[in-house]
Structure formats: structure tokens, C-alpha cells
Amino acid sequence: MSMHKALTIAGSDSSGGAGIQADLKTFQEKNVYGMTALTVIVAMDPNNSWNHQVFPIDTDTIRAQLATITDGIGVDAMKTGMLPTVDIIELAAKTIKEKQLKNVVIDPVMVCKGANEVLYPEHAQALREQLAPLATVITPNLFEASQLSGMDELKTVDDMIEAAKKIHALGAQYVVITGGGKLKHEKAVDVLYDGETAEVLESEMIDTPYTHGAGCTFSAAVTAELAKGAEVKEAIYAAKEFITAAIKESFPLNQYVGPTKHSALRLNQQS
């Protein structure tokens, strides 16, 4: 029996909670073989309030990693995460088109959770023009959705729906805006738009500050489900269930950060 294979083109989070570390843990939980093309290394300074330090990988090295996977192995689905330069965004887009990669999940990472500053504000245009049109699914959070749609801060479900329609118009087939617990709402709310219908996905509101890597984990779960052959909406619903369980059992890693628990859903189902 062949193993389903998924690729993540993303950054390394040295703390293990986000980036390729979260992606690989999620792929493993979903019984999908994970492969990586590393774009950037993110470290945190424990002597400076966990300040993020960002070290991009050169494009030749990324290109070599991608050739290893696309030419030497093949993939059933793929996702992007942190792409720290316009050149890397363009390389990812070129690879998707030239290799005719399918089941493409774009997680348009623009900030590190816990950091107040936007990492790469000048790259929103490149994400809009280069990657959004190639997305089977694009999974922005509220801030990223505002940047991609050109709207102001998204404060309501109606705002999320409007932004999703604008992002879909860029060429993405399915848009999932992850609002989570950020809206003033009694439930954790995401919005799914397929070009015709806007669907509000509600789940239990979980009162926790420990959500490091939640966006990476959600998009990786969508990717894994697509790699296994799931229909797009079913992949999104399954990913929502997966991340809800992971957040519900999230935990503090130190005084600065707390990741989600990737094994939570599996362990719950076994008990």
C-alpha cells in the first residue's frame, strides 16, 4: 500500500510549536508522510522577552530542496507557510505551476504569534498576485485576511464573509478565514467560502492563551486530508475538528509561549 505524501514549504520554529515542526507533527497524526522545504529559521531570544529572530534561507538551497521532493519523490498535497522574501514567494509559485502540483494549501503567514510587528508587510501584494490564484484552499487569519482583501480590521462575521469573497476573487478556489476566539462571539468562528456559499463554522470557545502554531496546524491538517483524497470541504471540517481538540489541550511551554497538543484528537478517540 502506498503512503500518502505531503509537502510543506515553510519555516522552522525552534520552539517546536509552529512552522514545519507543527506541520510534520500534524501530518504524522493524520498518517501522512511529511516532507519539507525549509524557507527560514525563526529563533526566539529568551533574554529579550522571546523576541523573534528571523534567518531566511537562500533561494538556491530552497530550490534544491524542492527538486529533491518534486522531481525525486512526488506529492499528493502541499502547503506553504512562512515565505520570508518576495523571491521565495515567486519560487514557490513557479514550482507549483511548473510541476503542476495539486491540492495546494496556502497559509499566508504574515506575523509570528507573540510578536506585535508585521514580519513582511511588503509581501502582501506578492501573496495576492502570485500564490492566491494557485490555492485550492487559502487559510488566512483575521489580520492576514484584511491584508489580502484590502479591508480594514475585520470585526464581525459579515466582515469575514466580505473579505472571503474578495480573496476568492483573487483566484483561490476555497477561502477559510480563521477567526477563532478573536471575534466578540460566544463561539469560535471561522468562515468558509467556495465562490457561491459562505458557511460559518462554529466550535466551542476555548479560553486559553496557548494557541501557538494553531494556524500552521490547521492548514497542515487540511493538507493532510487532501493528500488522502478527501473532498475539500470534508478536509476543512476534519481540520477544524483536529485543531479544536489540539487547542483544547494546549499547554504552556514556558512563560512566553504555549503550543497546541497535536496528539489530542487521537488520544481522545482512543480513550
UniProtKB/Swiss-Prot annotation:
Q: Which organism is it from?
A: Bacillus subtilis (strain 168)
Class of the enzyme per the UniProt entry, highest EC level: transferase
Q: What InterPro entries has UniProt attached to this entry?
A: HMP/HMP-P_kinase_dom (IPR004399), PM/HMP-P_kinase-1 (IPR013749), Ribokinase-like (IPR029056)
Q: Which Gene3D superfamilies match?
A: 3.40.1190.20
One GO term under biological process is:
thiamine biosynthetic process
Q: Which family does it belong to?
A: Belongs to the ThiD family.
What is this protein's gene name?
Answer: pdxK
Q: Which reactions appear under catalytic activity for this entry?
A: pyridoxal + ATP = pyridoxal 5'-phosphate + ADP + H(+)
From the UniProt record, which GO molecular function terms apply?
A: ATP binding; hydroxymethylpyrimidine kinase activity; metal ion binding; phosphomethylpyrimidine kinase activity; pyridoxal kinase activity
Residues binding ATP, per UniProt:
N141, T178, G179, G180, G181, K182, D190, I206, G215, K240
Q: Which keywords label this protein?
A: ATP-binding, Kinase, Magnesium, Metal-binding, Nucleotide-binding, Transferase
Query: EC number(s) for this protein?
Result: 2.7.1.35
Residue positions annotated to bind Mg(2+) are E144
* Pfam families according to UniProt: Phos_pyr_kin
Function per UniProt: Phosphorylates B6 vitamers; functions in a salvage pathway. Uses pyridoxal, pyridoxine, and pyridoxamine as substrates. Can also use hydroxymethylpyrimidine (HMP) as substrate.
Its Gene Ontology cellular component terms are: cytosol
Q: How does it assemble?
A: Homodimer.
Q: What is this protein called?
A: Pyridoxine kinase
